[in-house]
Amino acid sequence: MVEEVVLMKGNEAIAHAAIRCGADGYFGYPITPQSEVLETLAELKPWETTGMVVLQAESEVAAINMVYGGAGSGKMVLTSSSSPGVSLKQEGISYIAGAELPCLIVNVMRGGPGLGTIQPSQADYFQTVKGGGHGDYKLIALAPASVQEMADFVALGFELAFKYRNPAIILADGVIGQMMEKVVLPAQKPRRTEEEVIAQCPWAATGKAKGRKPNIITSLELKPEAMEINNLRFQAKYREIEKNEVRFEEINCEDAEYLIIAFGSMARIGQKAMELAREKGIKVGILRPITLWPFPTKAIAAYADKVKGMLVTELNAGQMIEDVRLAVNGKVKVEHFGRLGGIVPDPDEIVTALEEKIIK
C-alpha cells in the first residue's frame, strides 16, 4: 500500500496505521466507543496481506494476556478498549510493565464511573498517568487531538515502547475516536522477519535460542533485594523518559496573559475559545500536553511568572489540574473547568469560565 489521503474516523485510523506500520498482532474485545478499531481490522483482513494476526478474544482479560505473550516474543502487538475494558486489563498491563515488554494500548475513553455512558470523557487521566494497576510502574501516555494524530501516534507509540521496553498507551476521548477528518496514511512497512526480531530484541523469548542463551520473561523476584534492584532500574528508566520524551504544543503563548491548558478534544474546543477570547481583547494562549506522561512540567512552570492565570479544561471533575498546580508551585492562579457524564462543552462556556474564575 502506498501513501494515501483518506477521510475516516479516529478509530479507523488506529486500525489502518497499525497495519501500515508493520504490526504483528492485535488482540481485543469490542466495547463502545472504540469498537471500530476491531471492526476495521476485521474488514481489512491484514492476515491475507501482511500476515498480521487479528483476534477477538473472549474477554478484555484474555486480550491483554495475549498481548503479554506476543510482546514477550518481541512482536509488535497492540490492544484497544474503552474505560471499563481498560480497567479489566490493569493486572496484565502491570505484568507487562514489570516484565519490561513493549506493546501499545489504546483507550478511547467513555463516561464513568462504573458502566457509565458511551459518550466521551477524559476521566481516565489518573488511571493512565498515575499507574492504574498495582506497583510502581509508568506508561508512556500519548494524547491525540486529531484523527491524524490517532494514526501518527500508533507508529510513535511502538517506537517509544521498543526504545524503552515499556508499554505505551494512546489516551483518546470518544470525540477523537468517533470524529471524521482527513488523514494522510503512510506507505506500508513490511513486518519484521524472525531474524530481524531476534537481532533487534535480544531479550525476547522467541523459541529460537541457537547461538545465545535462553531468555525468561517474568516480573517475579522472590528475593526482596532483587526486586528492589529491579524497581530502581525501572525508576532510572522513567527518569530517562522524562528527560527525553516530553512533548507539547503551544499556540499564541508568546503574548498571552492567560493560558488554557487542555488535551485531546478539549484542546480543540479550547483553541476556538482562545480565538473568541482574543476577539474580546483577552490575550489567551493554549498549552496542550501531547505526552500526559512524561508531563510537560517544566514547560508549564516556565509560564508561572509570565501569565496572570491558567484555566485547565477537561472532560472530568479535575484530574490533570493537579499536575498543573504542582508544576506552577503556587506562583499563579490555576482553576478548573470541566463537564461530566459525556457532556461536551461549547467554546463559549470556556470563555465564560475564564472570565468568571480567572479574570474577575
Regions found by a protein language model. Name each.
Residues K9-A13, Q235-Y258, Q271:
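Glycine-/acidic-rich phosphate or pyrophosphate-binding loops and their flanking alpha/beta elements
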Residues E314-K360:
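Peripheral docking tails and interdomain loops at the edges
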Residues L139-E196, E349-K360:
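Structural signature of the thiamine diphosphate
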Residues V6-E43:
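N-terminal glycine-rich anion-binding loops that anchor highly charged ligand groups
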Residues G270-Y303:
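Generic long, charged, amphipathic alpha-helical segments
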Residues R165-E250:
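Conformationally flexible catalytic loops at phosphate/diphosphate-handling active centers
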Residues E36-T128, L142-F162:
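Thiamine diphosphate
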